[in-house]
């Protein structure tokens, strides 16, 4: 626990730290964080962060960033139990800069005592127009960390670019500089521990969870993904309700020790996954078994355009048809699927999809008699996709 305090003391030396006094008279350390996430899901992630007792201070809409404060226990809790975040950083510094000299001075002014005896690496990001690169930022910031530690402790810190003990994020967005300690690591949170089979176009797990929250799916409602691929949506739905954490190792474990305690909820759910191709169906079942939720998901082989039954919530990530010669096939698929989905819906059912071909699907849904009740753009990789919700 002493190592935890070392990290937080470093935060305490910046203006981004205060102590909160509770009625009992006890004082609790409150830390400022910034998290990165899928652009377009900021409000969804903010609500999730608040459910962990954190206070959201700023939401950067469509920029994939939220800023908030919370107790130090938020570090393991959010890394393991957040469903929609990508990366959690302890915010060391946030300021305006004009160039590389300002970046060097800002970083050099921080206390890096928490890196003592450890290796570190800078991970840099640059957004906007500048006369230097992100590599220049990493070089200058790295030298600033080394110089700061040398002046304070007379030792040279070890640099390890491949497997550092501590990752320091130095990110410049236009003229605003953010410096933080990455508690997640190089692999973002959406890389789930349970995935042993990858569909060639599998859905980002954090986006899948965002869609579940946008759908306002409830535990007693039936849910199907009729084009489930490797099973991401029903698997994440089961893990969310059963309170199963992301069991990966995260970067914070090299800075502090925390015992992960959780009590899974063994509730049985009405979850269904349908997939046209047997290879992917078998892969989805393997993923569900590895996640420990195969007992509550019914997988079946079938065509989404011929789905039957009645479901409260339908959530899916259909093919986008990015190759020109598939455009016609995608239009036919969307029209057939929209009609099939409507047949399986009641007056309270919701159909939630994500696609880059949102105009095509909107037309298909309208022709099928579905009403769009919600839509939002979401940046998925290099694509501008749209999540849409439809009802009868």
Swiss-Prot record:
S-adenosyl-L-methionine-dependent methyltransferase that catalyzes the methylation of the guanosine nucleotide at position 6 (m2G6) in tRNA. The keyword Transferase applies. The keyword S-adenosyl-L-methionine applies. Residues 73-183 form the THUMP domain. One of its GO terms (cellular component) is cytoplasm. This is tRNA (guanine(6)-N2)-methyltransferase. SUPFAM superfamilies: S-adenosyl-L-methionine-dependent methyltransferases (SSF53335), THUMP domain-like (SSF143437). It catalyses: guanosine(6) in tRNA + S-adenosyl-L-methionine = N(2)-methylguanosine(6) in tRNA + S-adenosyl-L-homocysteine + H(+). Keywords: Cytoplasm, Methyltransferase, RNA-binding, S-adenosyl-L-methionine, Transferase, tRNA processing. InterPro entries: DNA_methylase_N6_adenine_CS (IPR002052), RlmKL-like_Mtase (IPR000241), RlmKL-like_Mtase_CS (IPR053943), RlmL_1st (IPR054170), SAM-dependent_MTases_sf (IPR029063), THUMP_dom (IPR004114), tRNA_guanine-N2-MTase (IPR053485). S-adenosyl-L-methionine binds at residues 199-203, 230-232, 275, 303-304, 317. It is found in: Cytoplasm. Its EC number is 2.1.1.256. GO terms for biological process: tRNA methylation. Belongs to the methyltransferase superfamily. One of its GO terms (molecular function) is tRNA (guanine(6)-N2)-methyltransferase activity. It comes from Archaeoglobus fulgidus (strain ATCC 49558 / DSM 4304 / JCM 9628 / NBRC 100126 / VC-16). Coiled coil: none annotated. It holds the Pfam family THUMP.
